């Protein structure tokens, strides 16, 4: 909000500089950790209200839910229990930075561990050259495909969000074996095919299909086979179905592996969502 407020004449003295303004209210939670990235958190001596109050009387916020007919939304979590072997390899990767995938031993660097852990919950890992190595099976991907198969069998269409290319390839292979029709953003007619009911499943990455697309005519059920770290991508991707013109209640199904980084990832995402909702509510007052 700093950029918008500064553009219309707010913030004075040292707060005219974004970096100074940020340093006033926030601190880098990753400072001293050796990480190459930053994670800014609100200082405990401040609240969101302290940021909003100086400009609140000049703010006007519109929430689409306040003036559009938005369908009811239900969020459903699927907490998948991995097999003992999968959990053993996951913990080996987490603590010892290497993993055995169907006889192939792979090592990872500490700074890449978090992303690698998420791929490991799906039963595969990328090496340093970007080559994917799979385990013999993936309980989580099997559960996702089983859910899709059941829903399609009941006449539903599924908008499936994935996080990794190998994850999408593996799911696509399984859908083919089940004779479930699908397409992706690589198909020039994917929007038309989806909205016309020509395919059972539309597979999308939230970074490539999460903004601006009108997909509400094609179905009302979304599946996250792997969740995103980005709140913006989460909200925008879900909004492809949660929008005016959707004539059925929307279901958002989130698949995550129990006792893994995905549980913390989902919790962090929901916390971000809560903070943003509180922030927007303050700007309405």
What kind of feature is each model-predicted range?
Residues 13-16, 156-159, 172, 176-190:
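Conserved RecA-like helicase motor-core motifs
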Residues 168, 180-268, 272:
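Conserved RecA-like P-loop NTPase helicase motor core
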Residues 13-133, 137-156, 252, 269-271:
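Inter-lobe coupling linker of SF2 helicases/translocases
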Residues 1-30, 227, 232, 243:
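Signature of the SF2 helicase/ATPase Hel1-core->accessory helical subdomain module
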């Amino acid at each position: 909000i700093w950029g918008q407020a500064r553009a219309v004449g707010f913030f004075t003295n040292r707060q005219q500089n974004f970096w100074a303004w940020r340093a006033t209210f926030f601190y880098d939670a990753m400072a001293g950790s050796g990480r190459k990235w930053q994670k800014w958190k609100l200082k405990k001596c401040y609240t969101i209200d302290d940021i909003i109050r100086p400009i609140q009387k000049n703010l006007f916020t519109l929430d689409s839910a306040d003036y559009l007919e938005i369908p009811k939304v239900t969020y459903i979590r699927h907490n998948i229990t991995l097999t003992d072997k999968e959990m053993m390899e996951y913990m080996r990767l987490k603590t010892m930075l290497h993993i055995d995938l169907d006889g192939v031993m792979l090592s990872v660097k500490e700074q890449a561990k978090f992303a690698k852990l998420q791929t490991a919950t799906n039963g595969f890992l990328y090496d340093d050259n970007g080559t994917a190595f799979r385990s013999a099976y993936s309980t989580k991907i099997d559960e996702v495909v089983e859910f899709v198969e059941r829903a399609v069998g009941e006449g539903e269409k599924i908008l499936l969000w994935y996080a990794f290319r190998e994850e999408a390839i593996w799911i696509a292979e399984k859908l083919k074996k089940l004779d479930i029709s699908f397409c992706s953003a690589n198909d020039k007619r994917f929007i038309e095919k989806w909205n016309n009911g020509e395919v059972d499943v539309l597979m999308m990455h939230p970074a490539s299909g999460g903004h601006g697309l009108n997909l509400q005519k094609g179905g009302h059920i979304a599946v996250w086979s792997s969740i995103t770290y980005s709140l913006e991508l989460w909200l925008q991707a879900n909004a492809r179905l949660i929008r005016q013109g959707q004539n059925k209640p929307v279901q958002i199904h989130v698949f995550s592996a129990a006792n893994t980084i995905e549980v913390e990832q989902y919790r962090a995402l929901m916390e971000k969502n809560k903070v943003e909702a509180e922030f927007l509510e303050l700007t309405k007052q």
